[in-house]
Amino acid sequence: VDDTDAAHARALERGARTITAPTENGMGRGAIIEDPHGAALGLFTAAPGATDGVNPHGHGFMCWCELVTPDPKASAEFLAHVLGWTSTEKDMGDFTVTIASAGGHPVASLWKRCDDDAHPWKRARWYPYVQVDAIEVASARARTLGARLPCDLMPIPGVGRWQPTYDPTGCETALLEPSQCATGP
């Protein structure tokens, strides 16, 4: 974000709860909030020069996020107010997904959570995707480091191949090997 304190204030205006107040952290200024539906979100403004030389694209970088939420429309409005994101709905046949964009570029999808209390998508939360060059190698390495891979590697037509993982602490992350021209799930 351009201004962590201002984004934090806008989030509070829309019903967010502060987890960590805006704080300097050596690389910039950050805060962590919980949105009105309970999903945690970090806000960060890099210090001048802190990200010089960093290319946030390619192997090992976060390339996409999904927000699982009880109300994608309300969440899109919250993100528009706090982050300035825009959103559009995309018909996926059996369901509709909301695609959020920053600066005209798609950055996240917003999904309606599952209403089954036993389903892991019952809780509102962000689900990050990390780009990898070779998904079989990255998946094997994750397993070696103690990750649980709950299902087989799966294709996402027109996007690439992905592998959901749970690290040894239970944190969910997806590995994504994008197709040549993919820009997000």
Kindly give the residue locations of the regions a language model identified:
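N-terminal beta-strand motif that seeds the catalytic metal site of vicinal oxygen chelate
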Residues: 44-77, 82-85, 125-128, 176-185
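Vicinal oxygen chelate
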Residues: 1-37, 72-73, 128-172
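Short helix-capping and inter-helix turn/linker motifs at the boundaries of alpha-helical repeat units
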Residues: 21, 55-56, 119
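Conserved short beta-strand elements that form part of the metal-binding/catalytic scaffold
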Residues: 36-47, 86-123, 167-168, 172-179
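Core segments of cupin and vicinal oxygen chelate
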Residues: 13, 21-28, 32, 67-107, ...
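Long, histidine/aromatic-enriched segments associated with O2/redox biology
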Residues: 81, 100-104, 108, 112-114, ...
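Short glycine-enriched loop/turn motifs at secondary-structure junctions
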Residues: 25, 58-61, 121-125, 157
